[in-house]
Structures are given as structure tokens and as C-alpha cells.
Design a protein with these regions (language model features):
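Catalytic-core regions of core metabolic enzymes
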Residues: 26-499
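Intrinsically disordered, low-complexity segments enriched in serine/proline and basic residues
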Residues: 3, 11-17
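N-terminal leader/targeting segments
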Residues: 3-6, 35
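Generic short N-terminal amphipathic or hydrophobic helices
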Residues: 6-7, 30
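Short Gly/Ser/Thr- and charged-rich N-terminal loops/segments
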Residues: 17-20, 24
Length: 499
């Protein structure tokens, strides 16, 4: 359905955006001044000042310092609080003015009314990056909105950048910079190629078990109220970040429609950009305003903008932590021909139905491959390679499993593989599977999405975890597995200029 021509404000002060001739267009209403988008001080600081409560607990400046030390941060840490002399073995300074050394980044975990004066002190110290963890700003009331405007004005005049307010901050596991203001419950994150940014602290380490998920992170950023640093700034920063392969975002609003479209069009062909946007309904849009002080974007127009820019739009919160893995851990699909190896024919048929949604077609195995499979077990060389029948009657099943998978992966008629594994109730099977997957890691240029199931939840979890460690992304169900392959295929087509 073609969206009707409609005007919607996608910014507090910048542009009016609408549909015009089948494209996302913006007309100026004031000018949003794009400032320095080199955000390296937020993710690669050499020195950090932490201003706020240093009382031991599950939240506050004490926890920021503790998580930095636990993660192995190599830079200098300057705790600031007039009531302390030492914390966690570090000297505490009475005020920011008492620190003679250069400070790259400041954390403000203080009462909202104290933030403007502290921002002025930061300006006097020529500090260029501030993370305002404190809440109670535009998301709360009129006084908070005025305070937010005040700190933004101070920052602009001083050439400072702000993340927040009302934020859980950032993380960069590639260098041990994980300054979480909340107690995490684990020491560090798995380093990988996924950058995840959001208007919620739900993506920060204290809220999600990244260590258990084997979700390889390059950067994390909670925008908070995004009074300054926003989605466009992060897209531009991550565009050239050598650690980031795929960019994932949760957004409640778009501040500058014109800039968002321009930046997305430039970044998306280089790196996949996956976005989940809330506020799809009128009620959801209303509530998002009270959450971060956002001004919601018309969902239909946002969807059209994503399509125009080449952004992959996510449907569920869980997909933020599932679908990006296919881009981080696997090579891009060479084409849309899908191979299926399963333990039951029913799963294979369901997979074919799902695949059609994304333009994937089931691979027809070559006569040579079919003959090889039929030699392993009668009638095995079909479109859906069903391993269930041989498993039921062959004593040395694990011996032939490797032959079956190798034969399928060597077939040139297949570009990507939906790989279904049944763990069995026996731990010995898991070890045999893993022995095989270690041998084939990186050997075949096929995009592989794996779904693991079985009668023992602990065994399924163990094998899933160890497969992820080997670089084979495991998904929670059939549908998500096929969707991962589907969006990877669609992105590959667009990158080649075919869409």
C-alpha cells in the first residue's frame, strides 16, 4: 500500500518530513546544527572523571569505577566526591577543579539540579565529552525540560558533546572500557562485531546477559534522552569503526529526518543497519514521550524511510539480540539457494514456507550430490536432507553425520544452509557434534544458521553455547533461523546493487 502524502514532525526543532513522489522528503523548519561526530572520547578515553556517590552498592559512581577496574580499563580514573579520600584503591578528589591532569570524559551521577553547574565546571576545564547518567530531565516534567535545554546550551557554547541525560552510558569491550553505573553481575563482555545502540538502558550490560548469550559486542550506547548525541551521530561514528560489522538500534524517535536519511543511505551499503522502532501505535507513541521526552515519528513514514535507505527493520525486541549474529559470524550469502538438513521432514516443509517470505528458494541438489547421499543411506538425497531415518537404524550414526554434512556443504547448488541439530539425551553426542564442527569451521563459504533442539534443556543450552563460541550462530527457533538467512540474503542483494 502506498503511504498517503502526510506531514510529520520528526524533530524537536529541525525538519518536516513527508512522502513526495514515492520518496521520503524533508522541508526545513529551522536548522539542526550537526556538530563534531568524532565520538571517540566516549569509547576510547585515556582518562575518566566519575562524579557522584561513591557509596558501595548496586548503582552509582562506585559501581562505574568497579566495572572499569574489573574489565581491565587501562586509562586513568579520577573519582570526585568531597566526602571521600579513597575508593577502591584510588585517590578521590574533592572537586573537578582539583584535578590538574587532562580529562577526556566525565560521568555525572548527581542530582539533576546540580548538573548545569557541573557542566559549567567541565566547560572551564575544557572537557569535551560528558555522560549525564542523572535522570529527571525532559522525560519527567517542565523543570526537567528546562534543565535539559540549559545543559545543552552550555555544551554547545563550550564545544562539548553529551550522551544522555537519563542514560546507563556506554561500553567498549574491545579496550575494557565498560563503565556501567549498575552492578553487572559478571566481569566483561564477549568482543565481537555487533554495535547496539538504544533509547533504553535495557541494552546495557546490567540488563542483559551478554556473557551467557555469546553475543559479540563492539560498542554499546544508551542515548537516554539524546539531548545531543543521537542516532545519526552514532551511525557516522560506527561507519568507520573497525571493530563494528553490523549496527543495531532501538529507537523511539528520529530527531532529524533529513540527516537520518542521508547518513543511513551512506552507511547501510557499508554495514548492515538493523533498527527496531517503538511507538507503532498511538498509545505506544504517547508513552514513549514520557519515557525519554521523545517526539514520536509516524510509523508508516519511518518504514518507508528505512526501505529507501536500505535499513533492515526489526519486529521484536528479542531480534535485537538474535538476528545481528548472522552478519557478525557468517560470510554473506552468495545467492538465495537454501539447503536444508533436518531430523524431521515436517521441519523441512515449514522451513520452505518461511523461506519464501524472504525470496529464498530451496536448493535442488546436483545429481552428483544426490548420488553421494543415497550411497550413505537409501533415499537420503532429496531436496530436504532428512537425517532422521538413518539415525533410527544405524548404530554408527555419528560416524556418517559428518559425511552427510560435508557432502551437502560441498554442493555448489547451495548458497546458505538451515542446519537443524537434535542433541539426543546423551552428552557424548554433543561432544561428537562439536568435534565435527571444529574441523569444518571456516572451511566452507556458506551462510549457516543453526537451530538446536532436544529432550534435555541443559544439553541444548550447552551445545548452543559451544557452537556460538565456534562461530556458528544458533537461533531459538525455525522461524528466526530462516529470517536470519533471509535478511542476510536481501542485504547481500542490495549491496550488490540488485535492489
Amino acid at each position: 500500500m502506498k503511504p498517503t502524502d502526510k506531514i510529520v514532525n520528526v524533530s524537536h526543532s529541525s525538519h518536516l518530513c513527508h512522502w513526495q513522489g514515492g520518496a521520503f522528503a524533508c522541508g526545513k523548519r529551522g536548522i539542526y546544527m550537526s556538530r563534531n561526530t568524532d565520538l571517540s572520547l566516549f569509547f576510547e578515553p585515556k582518562s575518566v572523571a566519575v562524579i557522584g556517590s561513591l557509596r558501595e552498592g548496586y548503582f552509582g559512581g562506585y559501581v562505574v569505577i568497579k566495572t572499569l577496574l574489573n574489565a581491565g580499563f587501562k586509562g586513568k580514573i579520577f573519582p570526585v566526591n568531597p566526602s571521600y579520600q579513597e575508593v577502591l584503591g584510588l585517590k578521590v578528589y574533592p572537586s573537578l577543579k582539583d584535578i590538574s591532569e587532562k580529562i577526556d570524559l566525565v560521568f555525572l551521577i548527581i542530582n539533576r539540579r546540580s548538573v548545569p553547574d557541573m557542566m559549567r565546571t567541565c566547560a572551564d576545564k575544557r572537557i569535551k565529552a560528558v555522560i549525564v547518567v542523572a535522570d529527571g530531565f525532559a522525560e519527567r516534567d517542565e523543570e526537567g525540560a528546562k534543565l535539559q535545554n540549559e545543559i545543552l546550551k552550555i555544551a554547545k557554547q563550550a564545544g562539548m558533546r553529551i550522551i544522555g541525560p537519563n542514560t546507563a552510558g556506554v561500553a567498549n569491550p574491545t579496550n575494557g572500557f565498560i563503565p556501567d553505573p549498575y552492578e553487572m553481575g559478571y566481569r566483561t563482555l564477549k568482543t565481537g562485531g555487533i554495535a547496539i545502540c538504544a533509547q533504553t538502558g535495557m541494552i546495557n550490560p546490567q540488563a542483559f546477559p551478554y556473557g551467557d548469550l555469546h553475543y559479540g559486542v563492539s560498542k554499546i550506547c544508551d542515548y537516554g534522552n539524546k539531548c545531543d548525541v543521537d542516532e545519526c551521530d552514532m551511525l557516522e561514528y560506527l561507519e568507520n569503526d573497525r571493530h563494528t560489522k553490523v549496527i543495531t538500534m532501538y529507537l523511539e524517535s528520529i530527531r532529524d529526518g533529513r540527516r537520518f536519511l542521508e547518513v543511513s543511505k551512506r552507511v547501510a551499503p557499508k554495514k548492515p543497519v538493523l533498527i527496531l522502532k517503538s511507538g507503532r501505535t498511538k498509545e505506544g507513541a504517547r508513552v514513549s514521550t514520557s519515557h525519554t521526552g521523545s517526539l514520536a515519528v509516524d510509523d508508516q513514514i519511518f518504514g518507508a524511510a528505512c526501505k529507501q535507505a536500505g535499513i533492515i527493520r526489526l519486529e521484536k525486541f528479542s531480534e535485537l539480540f538474535e538476528l545481528p549474529k548472522i552478519f557478525d559470524a557468517q560470510p554473506p550469502p552468495r545467492g538465495g539457494r537454501l539447503g536444508i538438513v533436518t531430523f524431521t521432514g515436517g521441519v523441512g516443509v515449514l522451513a520452505i514456507d518461511e523461506a519464501a517470505k524472504y525470496g529464498l528458494s530451496v536448493s535442488k541438489l546436483s545429481p552428483e550430490t544426490s548420488a553421494k547421499l543415497n550411497a550413505i543411506f537409501p533415499d537420503l538425497g532429496k531436496t530436504i536432507v532428512d537425517i532422521g531415518p538413518p539415525m533410527a537404524v544405524i548404530d554408527n550414526y555419528m560416524d556418517i553425520y559428518s559425511k552427510i554434512l560435508k557432502t551437502v556443504l560441498e554442493d555448489d547448488t547451495m548458497d546458505c544452509l538451515f542446519n537443524v541439530i537434535w542433541t539426543s539425551p546423551f552428552e557424548s553426542f554433543v561432544e561428537e557434534y562439536l568435534k565435527f564442527y571444529r574441523k569444518i569451521k571456516g572451511k566452507y563459504q556458506r551462510t549457516i544458521a543453526t537451530w538446536i533442539y532436544g529432550p534435555s534443556v541443559p544439553l541444548v543450552q550447552e551445545m548452543s553455547s559451544r557452537m556460538e563460541d565456534l562461530g556458528f550462530p544458533v537461533f531459538p527457533d525455525l522461524e528466526t533461523s530462516i529470517k536470519a538467512l533471509g535478511i542476510a540474503y536481501q542485504y547481500a542483494i542490495r549491496k550488490k546493487g540488485g535492489a
